[in-house]
């Protein structure tokens, strides 16, 4: 899960991901876990 240390572009990217693909994206971002 992404934390508060994420760059602004990531935060903005997550804010527009409000569909069924969000879980899939979270899994893809799992390796970048802070």
Curated annotation (Swiss-Prot):
Protein name: Gastrin
Gene name of the record: GAST
A molecular function GO annotation: hormone activity
Residue positions, PTM Sulfotyrosine: 29
GO CC, alphabetical: extracellular space
Residues modified as Phenylalanine amide: 34
Leader sequence residues: none
Cellular location(s): Secreted
Function: Gastrin stimulates the stomach mucosa to produce and secrete hydrochloric acid and the pancreas to secrete its digestive enzymes. It also stimulates smooth muscle contraction and increases blood circulation and water secretion in the stomach and intestine.
Family: Belongs to the gastrin/cholecystokinin family.
Sequence positions bearing Pyrrolidone carboxylic acid: 1, 18
Superkingdom of the source species: Eukaryota
Keyword Transmembrane recorded: no
Biological classification of the source: Eukaryota, Metazoa, Chordata, Craniata, Vertebrata
GO biological process, one term: G protein-coupled receptor signaling pathway
Keywords assigned: Amidation, Cleavage on pair of basic residues, Hormone, Pyrrolidone carboxylic acid, Secreted, Sulfation
